[in-house]
């Protein structure tokens, strides 16, 4: 094989690895956004029910606490220092 062909193959492999890493990060961030939207919807439902009935819905609160207490998706992504 000629050096140019070897260089082209190495470049394709490096580009593929970079693409996999980038799309993995995008997928993780997308999951975080979806989870946050679900939490926001639950908070809105709890607020609406509290305004309507005068007390908060315990079912929604339990679901919200289960989502919030699930912990960090990535242990290295801790912002509470």
Curated annotation (Swiss-Prot):
One GO biological process term is:
symbiont-mediated suppression of host innate immune response
This entry's Gene Ontology molecular function terms read: CD4 receptor binding; lipid binding; monoatomic cation channel activity
Task: Kindly give the membrane topology term recorded for this protein.
Answer: Single-pass type I membrane protein
The protein's matches in HAMAP family, at most eight in alphabetical order, are given as: HIV_VPU
What this protein is reported to do is described as: Enhances virion budding by targeting host CD4 and Tetherin/BST2 to proteasome degradation. Degradation of CD4 prevents any unwanted premature interactions between viral Env and its host receptor CD4 in the endoplasmic reticulum. Degradation of antiretroviral protein Tetherin/BST2 is important for virion budding, as BST2 tethers new viral particles to the host cell membrane. Mechanistically, Vpu bridges either CD4 or BST2 to BTRC, a substrate recognition subunit of the Skp1/Cullin/F-box protein E3 ubiquitin ligase, induces their ubiquitination and subsequent proteasomal degradation.
> Belongs to which family?
Belongs to the HIV-1 VPU protein family.
- What is the protein's name according to its record? Protein Vpu
Question: Which organism is the protein's source?
Answer: Human immunodeficiency virus type 1 group M subtype B (isolate SF162) (HIV-1)
